[in-house]
Amino acid sequence: MPESASTARIFSTDHFVLPLPPDHRFPMAKYARLRERVAAVAGDLLAVPEAATPAQLALAHDPAYVNAVKAGTLPDAALRRIGFPWSPAMIERSRRSAGATVAACRSALASGCGINLAGGTHHAH
């Protein structure tokens, strides 16, 4: 479906999977299952979001924190708060999740509805 100002969108980031240990408490697989169920009833509304830009991240995050996350130099205590082991995939997933929120907000402003299926997996510091 071509995007237009009046088209609601549903943004999914389940394609950006974190490499987690088998015993990790985070249920990563639920996002793919959710997208599959949404696709069955509204697949034409699904979209993969762009990654949040550095400028967008700077609106909600301390630049030193963003740089430390990107470089993989966060202290162990900060990584424990995040709850995920550092990896390039964690950076991409986080940027896509934040980008999905931005995109869903823009969709809601334009069409009255925008949904981020990955909401809740990103936490600002």
Say what each PLM segment does.
Residues 1-125:
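HDAC/HDAC-like amidohydrolase catalytic core signature
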